[in-house]
A protein has these predicted regions:
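Phosphate-binding/switch loop-helix module in NTP-utilizing enzymes
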Residues: 74-128
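Hydrophobic positions on the alpha1 helix immediately C-terminal to the Walker A/P-loop
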Residues: 22, 26
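Conserved lysine of the Walker
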Residues: 19
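The conserved Walker
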Residues: 15
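Walker A (P-loop) ATP-phosphate-binding motif of ABC ATPase nucleotide-binding domains
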Residues: 8
Length: 186
């Protein structure tokens, strides 16, 4: 593997296979190496009976913004969920922290590029900007059906390292991600 070539790495795969878990482990690894992580996760929100009731956008180093809820009064809708239009602020926070002019010890984290995130105003432009820049390394997750719903974004992603995650390969993929992170900063 060339040093950080390409400088973006993505995971995809079916629900529940461990994409976000692998991403969090990769972020922990980067932080231990002294790398500043900038970006977001999209954790699900569960009620007391462990039923999924929504999603947040968890902006690293800032906190959570509600993305979607089953019982909300927002106008945007995706399946059973209502989408919070104000969640677009999360992307503005992330952009504010990135300096595309200088390559320093930063890593952009995107979990995930999916249908709910793409419903937010300005989100597609945000993802295109992140995918087209070549200064700051990126690790991310994209929805497994992105090639069908947003082929333009998928074309940008597939130019990079892409792992189809499975239960069988997830530990090997994590090791490859750690090696890739090392190649980007050492």
């Amino acid at each position: 593997m060339q040093p950080c070539e390409p400088n973006k790495l993505f995971l995809t795969g079916p629900p529940g296979v461990g994409k976000s878990t692998i991403m969090r482990k990769a972020v922990d690894y980067a932080i231990k190496k002294g790398i500043k992580t900038i970006g977001f996760f999209t954790p699900d929100i569960r009620d007391n009976s462990y039923k999924r009731v929504g999603f947040d956008i968890e902006v690293l180093n800032y906190g959570n913004v509600p993305l979607a809820r089953k019982n909300a009064e927002w106008n945007l809708r995706f399946g059973d969920y209502y989408i919070n239009p104000e969640a677009k602020q999360a992307f503005q926070i992330v952009l504010r922290d990135i300096d595309f002019e200088k390559k320093d010890r930063k890593l952009i984290v995107i979990d995930e590029i999916g249908p709910m995130e793409l419903m937010l105003e300005g989100s597609k432009e945000f993802f295109i900007l992140i995918l087209q820049q070549n200064v700051v390394p990126v690790i991310g997750v994209f929805h497994r059906k992105l090639s069908l719903t947003h082929p333009d974004l998928y074309r940008l992603i597939k130019k990079n390292i892409v792992y189809e995650l499975s239960i069988q390969n997830r530990e090997a993929v994590l090791m490859n991600i750690m090696k890739w992170i090392d190649s980007c900063y050492y």
